[in-house]
């Protein structure tokens, strides 16, 4: 089971859906999740659930429902995840978290929150997606201790 937080049109999670039991995609944009739903239907993907709303609130609700994902993908806006979302995800106990960040400062802050909640960053890969600018994307692999 995969939880995709900040999924946008769920490109990553839908690409993996056929190899997974269930996919939960969270995003604040109804428009993006409509695209995700259309994409799932067009590709015959029936094991995906799309949830619109604030990431922290939606993740907390899924935790209350008993969701225990094997892996979480995080792709937050520039402000990062924040402590409450990290705590909620940590309580769900995924073995791995893949964090896609567009801000090294908020990534560093959120990695600190993960380490305080039983996780260890294993690998961080910077990606120059916007050549010639100061912007850098980073992908961090975080594992439960």
Where are these regions (language model features)?
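Rossmann-like S-adenosyl-L-methionine
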Residues: 1-145
């Amino acid at each position: 089971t995969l939880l995709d937080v900040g999924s946008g049109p769920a490109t990553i999670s839908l690409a993996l859906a056929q190899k997974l039991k269930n996919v939960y995609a969270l995003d604040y944009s109804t428009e993006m999740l409509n695209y995700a739903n259309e994409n799932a239907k067009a590709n015959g993907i029936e094991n995906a659930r799309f949830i619109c709303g604030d990431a922290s609130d939606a993740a907390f609700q899924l935790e209350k429902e008993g969701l225990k994902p094997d892996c979480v993908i995080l792709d937050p806006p520039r402000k990062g995840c924040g402590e409450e979302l990290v705590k909620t995800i940590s309580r769900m106990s995924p073995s791995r978290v893949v964090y896609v960040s567009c801000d090294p400062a908020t990534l560093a802050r959120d990695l600190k929150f993960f380490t305080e909640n039983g996780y260890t960053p294993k690998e961080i890969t910077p990606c120059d997606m916007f050549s010639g600018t100061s912007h850098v994307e980073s992908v961090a692999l975080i594992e439960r201790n």
